């Protein structure tokens, strides 16, 4: 979404050969308008954007979690960040949660260091265990004195297939607060409404899911839906890995 609304320009891409197992992350064949076959390889692309109202340019990173050589991958990515004098990294993702699709999507903000956690008045994470590529990026960013924050939208595990425009909308709202800018939504509000109506219809046709959603709604309404903890986020990331829903 951000690549489109900010009219971002691709400036580079990381060579996928050292980092991806193509039997796991398979390349895809597509046809161009003139009927030519083109292979799209799984990789990470970096775009440059100049959002209206932003004091600085913004790099947007779009890709999927690599299968191999994470340390080298992260080092190569952050070398690009260093070339552009990046001072803050904001990672966006989603986690599966016991959250009903009928309620606002909770978004949790997690900072990479205790100092940043305190400065932003965030809930500290005491999680220890497996992590995803975002955790490795944050660790290396800290070593390079680059501030790092991650935003996680809690999406219903019973309707986890992408895209989820309602979750995207919630993450963008958080980004607007963090960056203190207005981000165009274009068709995102209509897409979010259509997505929820579609899930409403599906759940109405399945009594088991309908009852389950009702129970989730009651639980959420009773507790005002506290945001997911950093530990829950890390557990979800270790299970789902980094998903290519970058904004």
Identify the residue ranges that each predicted region occupies.
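Flexible, glycine/charged-enriched surface loops at secondary-structure junctions
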Residues: 10-14, 181-192, 209
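Internal, conserved structured core segments that host functional sites
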Residues: 64-114, 137
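Short, basic, glycine/proline-bearing loop/turn elements
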Residues: 56-67, 119-123
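Acidic, Ser/Thr-rich low-complexity intrinsically disordered segments
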Residues: 194-238
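Catalytic cores of processing enzymes, dominated by hydrolases/peptidases
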Residues: 98-182
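N-terminal short beta-loop-beta anion/metal-coordinating cradle
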Residues: 1-63
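Conserved small/polar residues in nucleotide/adenosyl-binding loops
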Residues: 240-247
């Amino acid at each position: 979404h951000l690549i489109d609304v900010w009219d971002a320009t691709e400036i580079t891409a990381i060579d996928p050969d050292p980092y991806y197992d193509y039997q796991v992350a398979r390349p895809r064949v597509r046809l161009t308008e003139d009927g030519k076959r083109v292979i799209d390889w799984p990789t990470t692309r970096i775009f440059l954007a100049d959002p209206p109202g932003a004091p600085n340019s913004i790099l947007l990173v779009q890709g999927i979690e690599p299968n191999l050589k994470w340390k080298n991958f992260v080092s190569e990515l952050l070398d690009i960040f260093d070339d552009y004098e990046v001072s803050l990294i904001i990672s966006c993702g989603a986690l599966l949660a016991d959250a009903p699709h009928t309620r606002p999507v909770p978004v949790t903000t997690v900072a990479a260091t205790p100092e940043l956690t305190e400065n932003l008045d965030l809930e500290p994470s005491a999680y220890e265990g497996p992590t995803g590529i975002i955790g490795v990026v944050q660790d290396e960013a800290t070593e390079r004195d680059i501030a790092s924050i991650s935003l996680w939208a809690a999406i219903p595990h019973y309707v986890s297939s992408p895209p989820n425009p309602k979750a995207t909308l919630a993450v963008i709202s958080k980004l607007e607060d963090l960056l203190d800018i207005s981000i165009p939504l274009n068709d995102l509000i209509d897409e979010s409404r259509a997505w929820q109506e579609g899930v409403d219809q599906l759940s109405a046709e399945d009594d088991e899911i309908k009852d389950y959603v009702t129970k989730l709604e009651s639980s959420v309404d009773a507790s005002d839906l506290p945001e997911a903890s950093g530990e829950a986020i890390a557990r979800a990331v270790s299970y789902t890995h980094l998903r290519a829903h970058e904004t």
